[in-house]
Amino acid sequence: MPKTPANVKPMDVLKSALSRNVLIDVKGNREYSGILEGYDVYMNIVLQNASEIINGENKGVYDRVLVRGDNVIFVSPSKGDGS
């Protein structure tokens, strides 16, 4: 039986996004876009080749970024990610 939104768990979504481009929206009008390298049960997230976007403006690219889980608002596949 295919999974419907009612029975999809957040950690399953993160697991399926490993090694793919994701967009993370965090508190303070910030976003990070990069390759999901890892995460834990607290939603701490590690991205590779991450772009930091503040108020819609790209502020820089970093080799590796750790986003603290209590700042995460949502995580979604990046636009144009064909994986």
Swiss-Prot record:
Residues 9-81 form the Sm domain. GO terms for biological process: mRNA splicing, via spliceosome. GO terms for cellular component: ribonucleoprotein complex; Sm-like protein family complex. PROSITE patterns: SM. It holds the Pfam family LSM. GO terms for molecular function: RNA binding. Keywords: Ribonucleoprotein. Belongs to the snRNP Sm proteins family. NCBIfam families: PRK00737.1. HAMAP family: Lsm_RuxX. This is Putative snRNP Sm-like protein.
